[in-house]
Amino acid sequence: MPTVALFKQDGNQNGEVQLNEAIFGIEPNNNVVFDAVIMQRASLRQGTHAVKNRSAVRGGGKKPWRQKGTGRARQGSIRSPQWVGGGTVFGPTPRSYSYKLPRKVRRLAIKSVLSQKVADESLVVVDALNFDAPKTKAFAEVLSNLNVNSKVLVVLEDDNTTAALAARNLKNVTVIPAKGLNVLDVINNDKLVITQGALSQVEEVLA
């Protein structure tokens, strides 16, 4: 069973914490992680691209000239696709790019990236992150005490709004609740700082 040090806010070690091996001690599956990242990035696409087809372009309701007798090619509308200013054929329309992987696959992906963080010694567990007021300076001091000076993902308990407000203005710091833990945020940050309460919530969901 994986074991990591448990720290206090002042940076001093406060014992150790045992991690669930089924979540933090598996062999990472890179293929599944890749699929999960592609899924998340697809859901971030706006999908608002659009063109005007011949029914949406302004004008063109009148036949430009009679069908026969002019010597010219027959035309039904000046907004047909072959005309300058005409509608576009088979152009992009607004759509949603989001899709879902099976739940087991999504869970295997998050377990894989968490296990990789433990293997890389990039997981920092803190007993709690409690602040009297949402002060950015106070949160920055905590990160300094924990010797975290790179891009970091901070995972908090779902109801710890004070700490979330204190950290939201810090550069290279991403704060999410335990229920929002996802593959893309974990791999986009060098360090993962998680409170003991949030760790329990994550293990409860993924176990």
UniProtKB/Swiss-Prot annotation:
The record's annotation in SUPFAM superfamilies points to: Ribosomal protein L4 (SSF52166)
A GO CC term assigned to this protein in UniProt: ribonucleoprotein complex
Q: What is this protein called?
A: Large ribosomal subunit protein uL4
Gene name for this UniProt entry: rplD
Could you cite one Gene Ontology molecular function of this protein?
Answer: rRNA binding
Q: Which HAMAP family match?
A: Ribosomal_uL4_B (MF_01328_B)
Natural source organism? Ligilactobacillus salivarius (strain UCC118)
Ranges annotated as biased composition (Basic residues)? 60-71
Q: Region annotation Disordered: residue ranges?
A: 49-78
Q: Which Pfam families match?
A: Ribosomal_L4
Which GO biological process annotations does it have?
translation
As for family, the record states: Belongs to the universal ribosomal protein uL4 family.
Which keywords has UniProt assigned to this entry? Answer: Ribonucleoprotein, Ribosomal protein, RNA-binding, rRNA-binding
Write out the function statement from the record: One of the primary rRNA binding proteins, this protein initially binds near the 5'-end of the 23S rRNA. It is important during the early stages of 50S assembly. It makes multiple contacts with different domains of the 23S rRNA in the assembled 50S subunit and ribosome.
Q: Does the keyword RNA-binding apply?
A: yes
**What is the annotated quaternary arrangement, including any partners?**
Part of the 50S ribosomal subunit.
